[in-house]
């Protein structure tokens, strides 16, 4: 079995990627403290063609050497904005017509594998701080909670790993894939 070179993968250029349709998902980072995690979010959002990232509170913003280390340039291909508070970001996104979801273990959360995205709907998914999770005041403002089913003793994943799991679930939904450039 021969590995495929990057050139043979036929990836779009940053300019082509900017013009391509995106998944109707915006990722909101609620006070993420690790710059490496922020970079991983950028890279994951690029891989799954998320619309944008909204960085909030203490979450670091590009340009940053530490973010770049894990983003590998995705901080330049995924649109992003910054809000001083996550509350402001959630309010703005709600006004833009997004359904707001907390990726968190909360009462009434839907298990990710049972969640059914609605065609034509835009989603803003809030990922919380590495220690405290999504702030309670933000969870209170969300339309729904999403929980990743787990079997281990920790019932916890690194926040950027959680992003990969959740965004893959949205990306793999045929109802949301319309127009996406999905590789091999």
Question: What are these language model-derived features?
Answer:
Residues 1-184:
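Post-transcriptional modification and biogenesis factors for structured RNAs
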């Amino acid at each position: 079995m021969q590995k495929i070179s990057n050139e043979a993968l036929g990836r779009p250029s940053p300019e082509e990627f900017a013009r391509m349709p995106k998944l109707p998902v915006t990722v909101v980072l609620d006070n993420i403290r690790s710059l490496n995690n922020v970079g991983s979010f950028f890279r994951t959002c690029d891989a799954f063609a998320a619309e944008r990232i909204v960085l909030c509170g203490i979450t670091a913003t590009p340009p940053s050497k530490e973010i770049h280390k894990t983003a590998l340039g995705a901080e330049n291909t995924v649109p992003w904005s910054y809000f001083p508070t996550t509350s402001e970001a959630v309010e703005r996104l709600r006004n833009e017509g997004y359904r707001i979801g907390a990726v968190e273990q909360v009462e009434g959360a839907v298990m990710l594998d049972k969640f059914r995205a609605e065609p034509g709907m835009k989603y803003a998914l809030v990922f919380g701080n590495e220690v405290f999770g999504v702030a309670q005041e933000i969870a209170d403002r969300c339309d729904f909670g999403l929980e990743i089913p787990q079997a281990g003793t920790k019932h916890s994943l690194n926040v950027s790993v959680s992003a990969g799991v959740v965004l893959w679930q949205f990306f793999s939904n045929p109802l949301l894939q319309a127009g996406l450039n999905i590789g091999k």
